[in-house]
Curated annotation (Swiss-Prot):
Any one Gene Ontology molecular-function term assigned to this protein's record: translation factor activity, RNA binding
Binding site for Zn(2+) 1: 508, 511, 530, 533
Gene name of the record: cpeb1
Family, as annotated: Belongs to the RRM CPEB family.
Residue numbers spanned by region Disordered: 223-244
BP GO terms, sorted: cellular response to amino acid stimulus; cellular response to hypoxia; cellular response to insulin stimulus; mRNA processing; negative regulation of cytoplasmic translation; regulation of mRNA 3'-end processing
Assembly: Interacts with kinesin, dynein, APLP1, APLP2, TENT2/GLD2 and APP. Both phosphorylated and non phosphorylated forms interact with APLP1. Interacts with TENT4B; the interaction is required for TENT4B-mediated translational control.
Source organism: Carassius auratus (Goldfish)
One GO location term (cellular component): cytoplasm
Protein name: Cytoplasmic polyadenylation element-binding protein 1
Cross-referenced SMART domains: RRM (SM00360)
Entry's localization field: Cytoplasm
Annotated coiled-coil segments of the chain: none
Length: 559
């Protein structure tokens, strides 16, 4: 393919930033004792050794070293099926703090691992086996049985090769009770005291700081359940399943695995929604520069909806209607999220600086344009219209009026050519000045073979920012799909658009039984899938970085 999917380094390198990863200064002596008991086999270079004034007492004074060894064994030998690595860890997840020990598999503490299907059912039985008192059961983390062999374990944790862990691997126990470092029973109160004295989990600001740098994560954060801690994974994050390892690692997104729940029934939908926003964070693989084709209209028919930009900041809906009602009955649509336009701005929020005016007839739009100041842009032949309006605190402000000529929604270069949807691409993030003819000209210059271009519109026949282009050959189609992102530069604007295969209602091409709403655009797949077939196909590591496409569920008028 002509473009590459690269991993966002900001999240993976967050541990190398200037932000203190862990508050381990008060625990330096603890880690030093642990390292001594383990034969100096750990790398403590990432642990702060500066003494702090707040640490007044040593929780380990008076305790024999043998009483601490089993706890250290538990903290180091985490189960490969531990579910806490699924989503965002809880503040009380003490095991996460051991990433400062530079263990190889904890370089990416939130990477996804295959879970043990029996993880949930074994929790209660493990408490019984270990003899944990009931009053401690809600204070200690629960782990599933390790299901990996010694070879796999050492491959995943090469830093543990020197440790005497054979008894742990053979016994399938969390604590190696038969080892030389085991000095007390699993139910001892020393364990509770030791864990309560440690503060080795990263703080909330540290975990959230890297996410606050990314607008996608901020948008996603608003979807979290406000009744729970922002660092608490959703309930389904700890559920088990053989298809839990989905889309980790190589992704153009800033590690969506941090916040999503793989087993959620709508995880694929969230991936598809994120892909629709990909133009904002990806580099263009093709660039087109030039003048847009000139426009010539004779008795144009306008959409009854117009864009009004640069309105006074203190304008009200009543003021807008009072200003424009002389041209005919109208309604006002304020900008909203996800393409929804409420009838009035939300209470407590300032207007966005632009609105949409919806008249009942295109004759009202004609009359409005006649009262506007017209600036003709050469050589495109595109006219800009400005209307002088006032508010209580602003006088004679020029607001831009952007109409839409309905004939600009479609362009056909060869009327006799049969349009094949299999050679059609979807183009998103279009600029408002691009009509169908200009889009066809740009795509033909880049890829060739364009026979049709269309602009998607709403119920008022006003463009919604996307379009379609049909080619007369598969070579041009595949070249456009592989390009994925194209930057368009004109004297008036610069815009990066996104190109994807045009999707239709289709049957799953894997099982041929269920509807296939999910499409994989990677060239190794390039087919429609139902939900179960998508999970089955992309549970393989080699295909796990593929991203789904879905048809936009918003209603639109496809001309």
């Amino acid at each position: 393919m002509a473009f590459s999917l690269s991993e966002n380094p900001r999240l993976l390198n967050c541990l190398d930033s200037d932000i203190p990863a862990l508050s381990t200064c008060s625990n330096a002596d603890t880690f030093s004792r642990m390292n001594t008991m383990l034969g100096n086999s750990l790398d403590l270079s990432g642990v702060c050794t500066t003494p702090t004034a707040k640490c007044k007492r040593d929780p380990f004074n008076g305790r024999p070293d043998s009483d601490l060894s089993a706890v250290r064994s538990r903290m180091l030998f985490l189960s490969g099926g531990q579910d806490s690595s699924r989503g965002l860890p809880d503040v009380s997840n003490w095991g996460l703090g051991l990433q400062s020990l530079s263990l190889s598999d904890w370089e990416r503490p939130w990477s996804s691992h295959d879970s043990d299907p029996s993880a949930q059912t074994n929790t209660a039985s493990l408490h019984g086996i270990l003899g944990t008192p009931s009053h401690l059961s809600n204070r200690l983390p629960s782990y599933s049985e390790p299901s990996i062999g010694a070879t796999d374990f050492l491959e995943r944790f090469p830093g543990m090769a020197r440790l005497n862990s054979q008894s742990f691997l053979d016994s399938h126990s969390i604590s190696p009770v038969d080892s030389e470092t085991s000095g007390f029973s699993s139910g001892s109160d020393h364990l509770s005291d030791l864990l309560s004295s440690l503060r080795i989990s990263p703080s909330v600001p540290f975990l959230m700081s890297s996410m606050q740098r990314d607008p996608l994560k901020l948008a996603l954060g608003s979807r979290l359940d406000h009744s729970s801690s922002p660092l608490t994974p959703p309930p389904s994050a700890t559920s088990s399943g053989g298809l839990s390892h989905r889309w980790p690692g190589a992704s153009i997104w800033p590690n969506w695995d941090l916040m999503k729940t793989p087993e959620s029934p709508f995880s694929i939908e969230r991936e598809a929604w994120l892909h629709r926003q990909a133009a904002s964070i990806n580099e263009a693989t093709f660039t087109w520069s030039g003048q847009l084709p000139p426009r010539h209209y004779q008795n144009p028919i306008y959409s009854c909806k117009v864009f009004l930009g640069g309105v006074p900041w203190d304008i009200t809906e009543a003021g807008l209607i009072n200003t424009f009602k002389c041209y005919g009955p109208l309604s006002v649509e304020w900008p909203g999220k996800d393409g929804k336009h409420p009838r009035c701005p939300p209470k407590g929020n300032m207007p966005k600086g632009y609105v949409y005016l919806v008249f009942e007839s295109d004759k009202s739009v004609r009359a409005l344009l006649q009262d506007c100041t017209e600036d003709l842009l050469h050589p495109e032949g595109y006219s800009e219209y400005y209307f002088k309006m006032s508010s209580r605190r602003m006088r004679c402000k020029d607001a831009q009026v952007i109409p839409w000529v309905i004939s600009d929604s479609n362009y056909v270069s060869c009327p006799s050519q049969r349009l094949d949807p299999r050679n059609t691409v979807f183009v998103g993030a279009l600029h408002g000045m691009l009509n169908a003819e200009a889009l066809a000209s740009i795509m033909n210059d880049l890829f060739g073979g364009v026979v049709y271009a269309g602009i998607d519109t709403d119920k008022h026949k006003y463009p919604i920012g996307s379009g379609r282009v049909t080619f007369n050959n598969q070579r041009s189609y595949l070249k456009a799909v592989s390009a994925a992102f194209v930057e368009i530069k004109t004297p008036k604007f610069t815009k990066k658009v996104q190109i994807d295969p045009y999707l239709e209602d289709a049957i799953c091409q894997s099982c041929s039984r269920e509807p296939g709403p999910f499409f994989c655009r990677d060239k190794t797949c390039f087919k429609y899938y139902c939900r179960s077939c998508w999970h089955r196909q992309h549970s393989m590591d080699i295909l796990s970085n593929h991203r789904p496409l879905m048809r936009n569920q918003k209603k639109r008028d496809v001309n």
